[in-house]
């Protein structure tokens, strides 16, 4: 029988989708930030393909420990920095030479305006409360560069306590262009967006397009 790790296969699939939009960075050193990246499986695949990438991991402190261990093992000799470095150096740490900067999630609001080339979130925003979604989106929409990308792969609808976490109600502003929008091949209850950041008042009208995605999913349930 063929044996494989489904989670690792999912990371391969997701990295393949994301890397198609990051190909221009193949020989450069972009800052790529993953929110809620688990142990670092997806980040390791991105890093293997964009070797100069400076990857910022944002997660729970206890998960940061696993990320530090795993990524240090996969990339022997990699420069892995953490919250201590941010505390001691401040934002200068972002200009340092590093492969991975591993930080608690709340540190996202320290990222300077228009400093990140790409954000990634796979199946963790769907676990967030309304307040946490608003916190992360405010930071992402400020710190992502114009023309930067946001890969957002999350459930259409998921109850989180008394809060109905709905993709079509995420606090996006209007200034996004859709590069990819599709249901996941392996998990059709997950929608996969890859979006490009646009300038303020771009006329992209993204929020209406987001609502249309939600309406289409609701109709599919009837």
Regions from the language model: what does each represent?
Residues 27-38:
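Conserved class I S-adenosyl-L-methionine
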Residues 40-50:
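Conserved SAM-binding loop of SAM-dependent methyltransferases across substrates and taxa
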Residues 1-27:
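Conserved Class I S-adenosyl-L-methionine-dependent methyltransferase catalytic core
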Residues 197-222:
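Membrane-proximal basic amphipathic "stem/tether" segments
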Residues 134-146:
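A short glycine-rich, Lys/Arg-flanked "PGG" loop and its adjoining helix->strand segment in the class I
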Residues 71-112:
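S-adenosyl-L-methionine
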Residues 120:
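A conserved beta-strand element that flanks and buttresses the S-adenosyl-L-methionine
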Residues 146-156:
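Conserved beta-strand signature within the Rossmann-like core of class I S-adenosyl-L-methionine
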């Amino acid at each position: 029988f063929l044996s494989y790790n489904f989670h690792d296969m999912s990371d391969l699939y997701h990295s393949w989708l994301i890397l198609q939009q990051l190909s221009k960075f193949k020989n450069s050193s972009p800052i790529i930030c993953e929110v809620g990246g688990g142990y670092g499986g997806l980040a390791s695949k991105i890093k293997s393909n964009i070797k100069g990438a400076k990857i910022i991991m944002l997660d729970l402190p206890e998960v940061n420990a696993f990320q530090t261990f795993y990524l240090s093992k996969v990339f022997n000799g990699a420069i892995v920095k953490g919250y201590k470095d941010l505390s001691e150096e401040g934002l200068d740490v972002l200009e340092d030479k590093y492969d991975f900067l591993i930080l608690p999630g709340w540190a996202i609001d320290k990222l300077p305006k228009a400093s990140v080339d790409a954000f990634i979130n796979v199946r963790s925003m769907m676990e967030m409360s309304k307040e946490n979604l608003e916190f992360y989106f405010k930071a992402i929409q400020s710190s992502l560069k114009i023309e930067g990308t946001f890969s957002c792969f999350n459930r259409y609808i998921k109850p989180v306590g008394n809060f109905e976490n709905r993709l079509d109600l995420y606090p996006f502003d209007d200034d996004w262009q859709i590069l990819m929008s599709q249901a996941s091949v392996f998990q059709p209850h997950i929608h996969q967006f890859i979006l490009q950041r646009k300038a303020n008042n771009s006329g992209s009208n993204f929020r209406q397009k987001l609502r249309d995605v939600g309406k289409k999913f609701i109709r599919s349930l009837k």
